[in-house]
Amino acid sequence: MSTINNPLNIKTRSHSSMGGGMIMDENKVPKSSIGMDKKIGGTTGLKSHRGALSDLTNNTHQTTGMATKTVQLSNNNIIMPQPTNTRNNIITRSKSIIDNGASLRNSALISGVLPNANGPVNKVQKRDIQSMEMMNNIPQQPVMIDDVDNDTNMIQEEQMVIDITEVPENIDIYDSHDPQCVGEYVNEIFAYYREKEQIDKIDKDYIKNQYHINERMRAILVDWMMAVHVRFKLLSETFFLSVNIVDRYLAKVMIPVTKLQLVGITAILLACKYEEIYSPQIKDFVHTSDDACTHAEVIDMERQILSTLQFHMSVATPLHFLRRFSKAAGSDSRTHSLSKYLSELSMVEYRMVQFVPSMIAAASIYVARRMTMKSGPYWNVTLEYYTCYKESEILQCAQELKEVRKRADTSNLKATRKKYLSSKLMEVAAIPVVEF
């Protein structure tokens, strides 16, 4: 323990005059006080002097049967008074820092490393003094750690929202247990359909090469084919395929007007053989046409069409894509039925031949959502991912489809509209058109 050479010149009040309320200077003891008698408990005791940093307690011992106080000059048994605090302690970060600084100063006081004002300072003392100064310089204002955590959480939540909006929904996750949905191959299947629709794309100007057939005649034929489709309760796949067969055949062969209905009947027959489980007989189709053709003529036209198309019957139609896109859109039965109505209406219009089947299906979904949803968005990331079309890319087709839907209310070709006015299909043909 280092000794303190120069005592501090601080005036203190004597212990006896103050009645023990104050402690004298521990480093300076008056000579007059050494050896003075003091009455303790009615007895006279010998008062011992108190050395620097010596024992501050009053020890008693028995001298001739009477208790007297003596002060032992011992540096080994230093006992510092412990402060008590009866208040409820609220622990804060700033209070913890202050308490730590106070503890450091107390420990330095006990160990005797507190320097005198004029005394030398060794390395250990200097390090302790610097530590205490650093403790005193720390701001006592508590740090609100919760504020920092809240800011970090807000940033993470914003990033999570952005990530969720940018990632399309997996629409096949709930069909993994169903082997008929072929979830493992569905992406490859529709990639193949997209390749097929480009390979089998129909010339949008083929009607110009027909000298006897115009757009109006084609529309009448397709509307009559829809009536036959409804009468025999055929599948929607059969209708779309039969119209595709007619367009592909007319794009390669010029025919007279008298053969146009025969081409339509034969196209329905071929589509039924390809799609239906039980196909109507040839005589049924002949009867439906009011005997406009014979059984032999249907057989002969069937041979010609298959030869011209090289027996190529597997094509991509709007219905293939429509079901997939409706699933991506999360459409209910009413919206899906309206989408089918718009797709089948597009088959009547020759101008819609310029669009590939996937585009017609995507535009049908878009227009149907416009007509049934009170507010947007009408196109989202999931639809963009599964349709492979942005909203800006389908607007032209959607505008054409909207005009087709508007003309259907006043057109004489009412087979498609009549079909979708039935309660079975939720009367979606009566839903008014929305301008956009």
Curated annotation (Swiss-Prot):
PROSITE patterns: CYCLINS. Gene3D superfamilies: Cyclin-like. One of its GO terms (biological process) is mitotic cell cycle. GO terms for cellular component: centrosome; cyclin-dependent protein kinase holoenzyme complex; cytoplasm; nuclear lumen; nucleus; spindle pole centrosome. It comes from the Eukaryota. Essential for the control of the cell cycle at the G2/M (mitosis) transition. This is G2/mitotic-specific cyclin-B. It comes from Dictyostelium discoideum (Social amoeba).
